[in-house]
Amino acid sequence: MFVRANDVKEILKVSQAMGYKVIRTLNTELQEKGFLTVQGRIPIEYLCERYKLDEQEVKDFLNKN
């Protein structure tokens, strides 16, 4: 499952601009590891891994909104 900047904004409680910055940074990390990325989206699994978030809680949060 991929999340967009608006989702990142809500999950991390940051501004929209910061949400885009987070996505760009994480996508760059994934590209350096050899993964293909989608501009403006980030896999929820990687977001949770990097920010030490509980993946199930984040998915539940997104499903409620």
Regions found by a protein language model. Give the residues of each.
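Residues within the helices of the helix-turn-helix
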Residues: 5-6, 45
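Charge-rich amphipathic alpha-helical interaction elements
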Residues: 2, 10-11
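Major-groove DNA-recognition helix of helix-turn-helix-type DNA-binding domains
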Residues: 12-51, 55-62
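N-terminal alpha-helical segment
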Residues: 1-4, 40
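Short hydrophobic/aromatic patches at helix-to-coil boundaries
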Residues: 3, 62-65
